[in-house]
Amino acid sequence: MQTALLKPKIIAVEPLGDHHAKVVMEPFERGYGHTLGNALRRVLLSSMVGYAPTEVTIAGVVHEYSTIDGVQEDVVNLLLNLKGVVFKLHNRDEVTVSLRKDGEGVVTAADIELPHDVEIINPNHVIAHLSAGGKLDMQIKVEQGRGYVPGNVRKFGDESGKVIGRIVLDASFSPVRRVSYAVESARVEQRTDLDKLVMNIETDGVISPEEAIRQSARILVDQLSVFAALEGTESAAEAASSRTPQIDPILLRPVDDLELTVRSANCLKAENIYYIGDLIQRTENELLKTPNLGRKSLNEIKEVLASRGLTLGMKLENWPPAGLEK
């Protein structure tokens, strides 16, 4: 009797427009279409990393209920329009950008002054309309985040929230705008009781629908891995014999396996950081004190570690293990 579960062998991606696609996966055992479709949908909507404006300072404006001479929109509508700008940051977690425009005309996202490692996905997005003599001068803080974070959460958790004129925004970081799924019938040879999973995904352009699916699947696999390693209750003798913490094999690999730039790799070796286990125990401040290792290299290291589920500043017991060569 066949007991092995089927795995999907056909994955098709059908573009439906800019940043919009239909992803079809089949065949699944009966019931798995809904099981996986619902899980992927929830992760896509709640757990994708993205970027959003979080704070704004506008010249001459004290609070969000103000108006600006020469600007058609009041500050509330101005901020709503600003939230529609889609930012993408490269090699950094936050940035402050400027928007300065005067004279009659339309203010769009393309008018925002950007550093070389920041881009705007929708430069034609309208932010405001200026009349003759109108002027707009703004400082916009953009941050990386996950999910939805209300402005009052950051405002009251941050003493700098008391600065007059600083407007803290509700931030929706998710790059996924809409997700839906449907389960249809599939057939393999004589079996007609199988599932076909059809997912309809629209993003804001920071990531593609295909990449969104990949990232959500990795998150699910990572979260479920703890259950795959689940063991029963140990006896007292077994518990005593297993008190020595087991070291994750990835920590024993050399930092060269991270495929960092030559500059970053050389800086780490100069500080006697030869293994990934050595690296994750260092803090950001410690690494920034390393000669020739700047913020750009630090961000590169953080991104590479994050892709493997690791961070800086982790604590390891019994490190280095006996016999580890330097």
UniProtKB/Swiss-Prot annotation:
One of its GO terms (cellular component) is DNA-directed RNA polymerase complex. It comes from the Bacteria. InterPro entries: DNA-dir_RNA_pol_insert, DNA-dir_RNA_pol_RpoA/D/Rpb3, DNA-dir_RpoA, RBP11-like, RNAP_asu_C, RNApol_insert_sf. Keywords: DNA-directed RNA polymerase, Nucleotidyltransferase, Transcription, Transferase. Residues 247-326 are annotated as: Alpha C-terminal domain (alpha-CTD). GO terms for molecular function: DNA binding; DNA-directed RNA polymerase activity; protein dimerization activity. Its EC number is 2.7.7.6. One of its GO terms (biological process) is DNA-templated transcription. Pfam families: RNA_pol_A_bac, RNA_pol_A_CTD, RNA_pol_L. Residues 1-231 are annotated as: Alpha N-terminal domain (alpha-NTD). It catalyses: RNA(n) + a ribonucleoside 5'-triphosphate = RNA(n+1) + diphosphate. Homodimer. The RNAP catalytic core consists of 2 alpha, 1 beta, 1 beta' and 1 omega subunit. When a sigma factor is associated with the core the holoenzyme is formed, which can initiate transcription. Belongs to the RNA polymerase alpha chain family. The N-terminal domain is essential for RNAP assembly and basal transcription, whereas the C-terminal domain is involved in interaction with transcriptional regulators and with upstream promoter elements. DNA-dependent RNA polymerase catalyzes the transcription of DNA into RNA using the four ribonucleoside triphosphates as substrates. This is DNA-directed RNA polymerase subunit alpha. It comes from Cupriavidus necator (strain ATCC 17699 / DSM 428 / KCTC 22496 / NCIMB 10442 / H16 / Stanier 337).
